[in-house]
């Protein structure tokens, strides 16, 4: 028999699922524009702002559920986890906006050397893979991608560090260099937040607090 709280929890899940779609779209748009032509800053900003609003609404709804139903065990874990994930998704929107601003202000990495473009394209593909795996896991309430997430996170970290080592040897002073360093940093932070979201999902489904390493 369905409980009254189940309807409220499904509503919370629906809000977070919508945030997943918006965050994915914002990052994909901003990243594509960094390598190609486009003018999506206003659209990404609108999506980012909406994600912040939705995160606040998720928090308000979560608090309302806690006060009204005083959930325990798995119900409480779900409420806390969805609230945490909504924050991570809002941060993804902000990093997408940061990338969109770099695209607008510095022309992305379209004017960078080919090796820089390839570096960011490779790193961006891995980050988008992490985003898609994490968001699918949240939607399906599944932990089957934990090893792949861990592997991709290590790869992104290694790419980030090796890129900084290589770019430090570049003696040119150009807007393109600034742009590339900013974008790889934002990509690295997006990957971090996907790990945080997955760790929160592990807690929700198992009750254990585990770090993905």
State where each predicted segment sits.
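Cytosolic, long alpha-helical scaffolding segments
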Residues: 1-213
């Amino acid at each position: 028999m369905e409980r009254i709280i189940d309807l409220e929890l499904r509503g919370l899940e629906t809000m977070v699922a919508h945030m997943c779609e918006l965050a994915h779209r914002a990052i994909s748009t901003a990243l594509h524009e960094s390598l190609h032509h486009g003018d999506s800053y206003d659209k990404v900003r609108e999506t980012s702002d909406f994600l912040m609003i939705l995160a606040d609404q998720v928090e308000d709804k979560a608090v309302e559920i806690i006060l009204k139903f005083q959930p325990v065990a798995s119900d409480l874990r779900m409420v806390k986890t969805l609230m945490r994930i909504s924050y991570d998704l809002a941060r993804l929107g902000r990093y997408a906006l940061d990338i969109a601003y770099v695209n607008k202000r510095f022309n992305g990495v379209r004017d960078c050397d080919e090796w820089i473009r390839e570096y960011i394209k490779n790193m961006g593909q891995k980050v988008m893979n992490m985003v898609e795996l994490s968001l699918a896991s949240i939607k399906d309430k599944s932990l089957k991608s934990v090893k792949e997430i861990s592997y991709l996170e290590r790869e992104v970290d290694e790419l980030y560090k090796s890129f900084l080592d290589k770019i430090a040897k570049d003696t040119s002073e150009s807007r393109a260099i600034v742009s590339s360093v900013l974008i790889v940093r934002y990509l690295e932070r997006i990957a971090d937040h996907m790990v945080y979201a997955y760790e929160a999902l592990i807690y929700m489904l198992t009750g254990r607090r585990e770090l993905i390493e």
